[in-house]
Every structure is written in structure tokens, then in C-alpha cells.
Swiss-Prot record:
Signal sequence coordinates: none
Catalysis performed (reactions): ATP + H2O + 4 H(+)(in) = ADP + phosphate + 5 H(+)(out)
Lineage, opening ranks: Eukaryota, Fungi, Dikarya, Ascomycota, Pezizomycotina
Physiological role: Mitochondrial membrane ATP synthase (F(1)F(0) ATP synthase or Complex V) produces ATP from ADP in the presence of a proton gradient across the membrane which is generated by electron transport complexes of the respiratory chain. F-type ATPases consist of two structural domains, F(1) - containing the extramembraneous catalytic core, and F(0) - containing the membrane proton channel, linked together by a central stalk and a peripheral stalk. During catalysis, ATP synthesis in the catalytic domain of F(1) is coupled via a rotary mechanism of the central stalk subunits to proton translocation.
GO molecular function: ATP binding
Encoding gene, per UniProt annotation: atp2
Protein name: ATP synthase subunit beta, mitochondrial
Binding site residues for ATP: 44-51
Family membership noted in the UniProt record: Belongs to the ATPase alpha/beta chains family.
Organism: Penicillium glabrum (Penicillium frequentans)
GO cellular component, as recorded: mitochondrial inner membrane; proton-transporting ATP synthase complex
Keyword set, alphabetical order: Allergen, ATP synthesis, ATP-binding, CF(1), Hydrogen ion transport, Ion transport, Membrane, Mitochondrion, Mitochondrion inner membrane, Nucleotide-binding, Translocase, Transport
Membrane-crossing segments per the record: none
InterPro entries, A to Z: ATPase_a/bsu_AS, P-loop_NTPase
Length: 114
């Protein structure tokens, strides 16, 4: 229903950067990278329906972390954000503290931090 509302108000075609240069990158909703590795090419772009991106929307009465989480290519955005240096200066905070999780991500981040 959300895409129907957006489509009724604005006629927009979404383009998503695709290719090896986007793997492991943090990309905002407009397709621009927000990590510290700089710009990437669009590789011709692709329609959202042709990519393997899943957007999950939550209700407004849920916590912000639950609403904003989505999975892209099998990687949790919150885990990727936890690896980025100086992310709090950009005003972006991970939905889950990766150092509190009991996983391989926790071990990797603790080694990276020290």
C-alpha cells in the first residue's frame, strides 16, 4: 500500500546501484553511498523489481530500530553500520549494538576495535 500511495503522489522510478563495487557498501535510499569509501558508479542501474533487495516496513508504534531495519544481499545494515568509523558524527546509529550480540560479528568487531 505504501508504494501505491507514493505512486499516486509522485511518478518516480527508483534506480539501485548494482555490481561488485556495491558489495559491503552502505547506501542510502537515493542510491548514494554514505560510507567513507567515496562514490560508486551505477553500473547502468537496475529497476528495484530486478534486484535482490528486501524492504521491511514496521508500524509507527514499534521502536525505530525495528522500523528501519532491512536486509540487503543477506547482510544486516545494522552490522555494517557498526563497522563504520565516525558514524555517530553523521547522526546515524545502528539499530542493534553489534558488540552486545553473541555472534561472529561481535568477535570481529572486538578485534577491529582493539
Amino acid at each position: 500500500k505504501v508504494h501505491q500511495v507514493i505512486g499516486a503522489v509522485v511518478d518516480v522510478k527508483f534506480r539501485v546501484p548494482v555490481g561488485a563495487g556495491t558489495l559491503g557498501r552502505i547506501i542510502n535510499v537515493t542510491g548514494d553511498p554514505i560510507d567513507e569509501r567515496g562514490k560508486i558508479g551505477l553500473f547502468g542501474g537496475a529497476g528495484v523489481g530486478k534486484t535482490k533487495v528486501a524492504l521491511v516496513f514496521g508500524q509507527m508504534n514499534e521502536p525505530p530500530g525495528a522500523r528501519a531495519r532491512f536486509t540487503q544481499a543477506g547482510s544486516e545494515v545494522s552490522a555494517l553500520l557498526g563497522r563504520m568509523r565516525g558514524i555517530s558524527e553523521l547522526g546515524i546509529y545502528p539499530a542493534v549494538d553489534p558488540l552486545d550480540s553473541k555472534s561472529r560479528v561481535q568477535q570481529m568487531l572486538q578485534e577491529y576495535k582493539s
